[in-house]
């Protein structure tokens, strides 16, 4: 039986969108709340709950007496694949099938031997949970996991529809220069082009699942008692200010992986992780044998898929650069096929390259051997790179990765973009420039400046540190 002191704890139920890039920051935030004395209920879908057990072992989800894991259905058919589920499929299914199980879980928790649920922390694109918050009379904070610039861009989807920029007239608009159209009317986004908007605008169908999903999700922004963003003011102030009109309670509390310094001493939390793929820890030992700033780190994240031809072009570009590299390539990265890297590539690069399927990216990016990050420009990857002072070569795939790429290359001056139609010569040239060239040196220095500002944001008295304190006291613990 729980003690009186235990039963009086605030109880946060945390529910991420069921993809790796959303689960990680939600887990980091949940650990911070736990450090502040909250009882935590962390809710995955059934599919990812099972994947966590497979990747981290059955004990990974045992949690703690005050940090529990639960799962609810998402309405999709069962699958044993080691891959991210269909994003459109999830977006269509979750709002229809997850609300009642989520409400049932809250009711069960409220009737059990744990403190009653006192607040909901929901992913910003899981706004169906607001109906549960209303039903149980609970405050709900919406955690939007993209960058602030990506978040701002999503909030203008409705304007793009109303002004008839989208949907596209026909598929020729994807290649005829139309996406270069400059939009000078969006506050906080100077010189932004259609191509820099999150990719779900690239449709000719007004009923497109993803376009409509974000139109609906952004309409829910004012309904959260607060919005949290995994960024810091010095980096994205210009993108945050315009969104305050939609919800004045916006808290920038990132980089969240750096905020973990306040909970790292808690041994009880060490076994609680969120990687859905089994990590290869040997890559750190390999990096230990390399000189500072000598290794190209390549990782296109948990969702990106590419053609076999693109995979081969990236491979030979890396090989021809003659630089050491660590390449993380998921088995499912080539759409519908097992990722097969040519044997002759492996032979050519065996002395200077390591290829593996997954790693602890935070550990890799803070390793002194890493000189540049070849990335898909997902936000977790981007902010982890920024906060470790590592410049980037950007190959955005979908969602707000296009926006992040634009800001890295133009606003923050820490990145070069590779064309979607990737060619080995361009990969080789950009790797050499970033590792040896004058532009690369300038971007490295700029990245180190941003690293310093990120460290200041999360230090005691820094902007993100204070915002987290205010969020807890003024929102989550407010009676």
UniProtKB/Swiss-Prot annotation:
Keywords: Glycosyltransferase, Transferase
UniProt EC number: 2.4.1.-
Binding site for UDP-alpha-D-glucose: 302, 358-359, 376-384, 398-401
Top EC class for this record: transferase
Domain of life of the source: Eukaryota
Record Gene3D superfamilies: Glycogen Phosphorylase B
A Gene Ontology molecular function term of the record: quercetin 3-O-glucosyltransferase activity
Signal peptide positions (record): none
Similarity section: Belongs to the UDP-glycosyltransferase family.
Protein's job: May glycosylate diterpenes or flavonols in leaves.
Full protein name: UDP-glycosyltransferase 85A8
Organism of provenance: Stevia rebaudiana (Stevia)
